[in-house]
Amino acid sequence: MKHILFPTVSAADAFIADLQSRGVVQPQVGTMNMSRRVQQAAGDTMSTGTTTGTVTTPAATTTTTNTTSYADGGYVDGGGTAEDAGAGAVKGTVAGALTGAAAAVIGTAATVATGGLALPVILGMTALGSGVGAAVGAVGGAAGVDETGGTSYDSYSDSYTTNYEADDAYYNRVNESVNAGGRAVAVDDNVPQDVLMDAVNKHGGEILNS
């Protein structure tokens, strides 16, 4: 998962909408909580004596998996044509753009209830989506393929890290940027690197980790 800093919320939202319009990411926007890695004092008060020290809690991550199905195109079960997928891809792209615009809500309150920072999470395409569907639909339409019916829907498997612990320097960098009106976005590693870098540069982003 890459963490990308943008100077403004609008730049981050434009970046998200840009990737969605290119069909390389899912229309859904998840959320990840970034918190400061905690240092705890460790003590042993056994009868033989007392030992004190400081231990650093290792980075801990929690992964959740959600699968969502949509009833307006993209993947066809029990029939359908390439045109079905293409039609669904167009709808998915439009819905994705709207989701990108609405993503500003996620970062409006930078601090989440459990402590830390809330980062929008952008996932790559793990199933047939707008990029693939649009290409298939274009081919099917040009060939004059007829409709054959069937139930059409998109199925996305959303598996990503929902909690991330960062050291002091890393967390402070993100926190200071957010407090200054910026936005940090987490992007799945399976998003095509060339497309990602083009969008990052276009919208003034900076990748914090490789």
Swiss-Prot record:
Top-level taxonomic group: Bacteria
Its protein name is Uncharacterized protein DR_1987
Other remarks?
Answer: On the 2D-gel the determined pI of this unknown protein is: 4.23, its MW is: 31.5 kDa.
